[in-house]
Design a protein with these regions (language model features):
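A metal-dependent, Asp-based hydrolase signature
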Residues: 49-150
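Structural recognition of alpha->loop->beta junctions
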Residues: 188-199, 262-287
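Substrate-recognition "cap/lid" segment bordering the active-site pocket of phosphatases
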Residues: 171-224, 229-241, 248
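Acidic, Mg2+-coordinating phosphoryl-transfer loop and its flanking beta/alpha structural elements
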Residues: 225-274
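Conserved SAM-binding loop
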Residues: 14, 168, 225
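Short active-site oxyanion
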Residues: 166-170, 222, 271-272
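Substrate-recognition element of Asp-dependent hydrolases with the DxDx(T/V) motif
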Residues: 25, 134-141, 145-184, 198
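Active-site neighborhood of HAD-like aspartate-dependent phosphohydrolases
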Residues: 1-50, 56-59, 63-68
Length: 287
């Protein structure tokens, strides 16, 4: 596959977040509401689309838990399938809750505390010390921080090879400060004008704006975007349809929630141009 520019996702591509972000989703809902979803269900929300932002995924998981309490007769499979059919994301999750009677809907809304969920999530993920530094206040709970439990997935030799041969950018749903920590951990130096984080755009994946803008900044002709979710591949597909002046490739990486042959099939169905076992295989795939 020929490309002159490579754009990388962070979570599930450069660092393993199964024990950090995904754990924080599950435990935030548990701490706020006393029950939660199973961690494998997070991938079902991701596959439904529109959940690049893990705070919003946490909000949607909480909605599911609260709606079930109020009589919503759906399991997580049915709930996420319906979310997907409605276009994905938090707005779709809220629409599913609209199946409840009005009084039950009102009770769900009254109990749904997005601020408490976000503060709990950040305290669990960052830990008390980083929470005080980055959030500017006292954490609601004392924790060591799951951010310290993120094994790297990319070899130093891969970073050296890819940055020597390609213009390299980053497109991630992380806040900028948390992206800095992950990029420093893997040894990837990406200037601010060559990356998009949660702080830089509102639309989120799979909207193509950020990827197209990165391509413009690089003056690229052929852009490969590697990510671990279906929305990453959809972002590349949407960019290819939107920007007629360039070619965009979507590459699925099997070190996130999608793995094995089932993961390959899902990526292929989403329009992936290639699927790799891990980010290190990009060295051989790209030329």
């Amino acid at each position: 596959m020929y490309a002159d520019t490579l754009v990388l996702d962070v979570d599930g591509v450069l660092v393993d977040v199964a024990g950090s972000y995904r754990r924080a989703v599950v435990e935030s809902v548990e701490r706020v509401y006393g029950e939660t979803i199973a961690q494998p269900a997070i991938q079902q929300f991701k596959d439904a689309g529109g959940f690049n932002n893990d705070w919003e995924l946490t909000d949607a998981a909480a909605l599911f838990v609260l709606a079930r309490r109020e009589g919503l007769r759906m399991d997580v499979d049915e709930f996420t399938d319906r979310v997907r059919d409605l276009g994905g994301g938090l707005d779709a999750a809220k629409e599913v809750v609209g199946d409840l009677p009005r009084v039950a809907q009102a009770r769900v809304r009254d109990q749904w505390d997005r601020d408490a969920l976000r503060e709990t999530f950040q305290a669990l993920y960052l830990g008390a010390e980083l929470y005080r530094e980055l959030e500017g206040g006292e954490p609601p709970i004392e924790a060591d921080g799951y951010i310290h439990d993120e094994p790297t997935l990319v070899d130093p030799e891969t970073i050296a090879d890819l940055t020597a041969r390609f213009d390299v950018g980053v497109l991630t749903g992380r806040p900028a400060a948390e992206a800095d920590i992950a990029l420093e951990r893997v040894g990837l130096d990406v200037p601010e004008d060559r990356r998009f984080t949660m702080d830089d755009w509102e639309e989120g994946k799979p909207h193509p704006r950020a990827l197209v803008e990165l391509a413009e900044r690089f003056d690229a002709e052929r852009v490969a975007f590697a990510g671990d979710t279906l929305d990453d591949v959809r972002t590349a597909r949407n960019a290819d349809e939107t920007d007629e002046t360039r070619v965009y490739y979507g590459i699925g990486v099997l070190t996130g929630g999608l793995t094995g042959e089932a993961g390959r099939e899902k990526f292929a169905n989403a329009g992936a141009d290639a699927v790799v076992e891990d980010v290190n295989e990009l060295v051989e795939l790209l030329e």
